[in-house]
């Protein structure tokens, strides 16, 4: 258990949850607020998987086509816009917009790494891990997270997962509880 003002050690929480589950038990965590009310959370592990094409499934021709389109990109805010094209083989990257495709910052940076066979920077490791699982990621801003993560194309169902990188995660239980409340709208 913890007070709402207690700091969170996310690594410790992960280890504790795994230990509890290894004994065949349910990991329940209780947070006590300043009015002495208790909120209980069930903790678990998620291993998202989806149906999106993986980078390794693209043919050399498709990768070359993406490279040609990437060379035509236009900086837009913190992302990129790829103007007028006839086909886009990577549906999990970017969104259609004004006869082109808009890529968010992490999508464009990841695409650049893949197309140019560069070393993956540490800040893209989580994004890459999720891409390797075949999921589709969209901004999670409205839900208090970095990404909302889909196992199917957007619009077929609600996002089954919200993902927040640990370096952006709440630092105390009050902030974590607020994030959970916000995410319930998903």
Q: Predicted regions: what is each one?
A:
Residues 1-145, 149-186:
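Long Lys/Arg-rich low-complexity intrinsically disordered regions in nucleic-acid-associated proteins
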């Amino acid at each position: 258990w913890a007070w709402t003002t207690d700091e969170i050690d996310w690594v410790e929480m992960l280890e504790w949850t795994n230990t509890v589950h290894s004994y065949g038990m349910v990991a329940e965590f209780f947070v006590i607020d300043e009015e002495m009310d208790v909120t209980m959370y069930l903790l678990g592990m998620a291993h998202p998987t989806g149906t999106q094409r993986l980078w390794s499934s693209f043919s050399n021709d498709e990768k070359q086509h993406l490279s040609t389109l990437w060379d035509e990109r236009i900086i837009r805010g913190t992302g990129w816009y790829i103007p007028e094209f006839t086909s886009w083989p990577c549906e999990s990257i970017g969104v259609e917009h004004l006869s082109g495709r808009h890529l968010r910052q992490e999508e464009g940076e990841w695409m650049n790494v893949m197309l140019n066979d560069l070393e993956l920077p540490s800040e893209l490791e989580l994004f890459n891990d999720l891409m390797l699982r075949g999921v589709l990621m969209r901004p999670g801003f409205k839900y208090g997270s970095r990404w909302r993560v889909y196992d199917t194309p957007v619009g077929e169902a609600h996002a089954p997962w919200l993902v927040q990188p640990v370096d952006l995660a709440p630092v105390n239980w009050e902030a974590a509880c607020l994030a959970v409340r916000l995410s319930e709208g998903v």
